[in-house]
Amino acid sequence: MSSGGLLLLLGLLTLWAELTPVSGQDRPKYCDLPADSGPCRARKRHFYYNSRSNQCEEFTYGGCRGNENNFETKDKCHYTCVAPPRRRPL
């Protein structure tokens, strides 16, 4: 196989690995908790992972307590719950 073919194959394998859905075993358990705005009354725009839609969605956070399924940015939610780094076998 030519070096160009090997590079194409490597690129396709990398893309496939990134697009393969994450198994629930790699996702922290708190990602499956429901959105919880907490008892306080601040109105902060936060994000939580919705396990039904497999997406990070916006909710209004009260500013205190709640649970760990609570992220200041959609990117952090996505990195943690949608596409966490995969564990590599040793």
Curated annotation (Swiss-Prot):
Site positions (Reactive bond for trypsin) are 41-42
Q: Where is each BPTI/Kunitz inhibitor domain found?
A: 31-81
| PROSITE patterns tied to this protein | BPTI_KUNITZ_1, BPTI_KUNITZ_2
Q: What is its main location?
A: secreted
The entry lists its GO molecular-function terms as:
serine-type endopeptidase inhibitor activity
Check the UniProt entry and state the signal peptide residues, or none.
1-24
- Keywords recorded for this protein, A-Z: Disulfide bond, Protease inhibitor, Pyrrolidone carboxylic acid, Secreted, Serine protease inhibitor, Signal
Q: Which InterPro entries match?
A: Kunitz_BPTI, Kunitz_BPTI_sf, Prtase_inh_Kunz-CS, TFPI/VKTCI-like
Disulfide cross-links: 31-81, 40-64, 56-77
PTM-bearing positions, type Pyrrolidone carboxylic acid: 25
Task: Specify whether Cell inner membrane is a keyword of the entry.
Answer: no
The entry's localization annotation reads: Secreted
Which tissues is this protein detected in according to the database? Expressed by the venom gland.
- Similarity annotation: Belongs to the venom Kunitz-type family.
PANTHER family from the xrefs? BPTI_KUNITZ INHIBITOR DOMAIN-CONTAINING PROTEIN, KUNITZ-TYPE PROTEASE INHIBITOR-RELATED
Q: What does this protein do?
A: Serine protease inhibitor.
Q: What is this protein called?
A: Kunitz-type serine protease inhibitor kunitoxin-Tel1
Q: Which organism is it from?
A: Telescopus dhara (Egyptian catsnake)
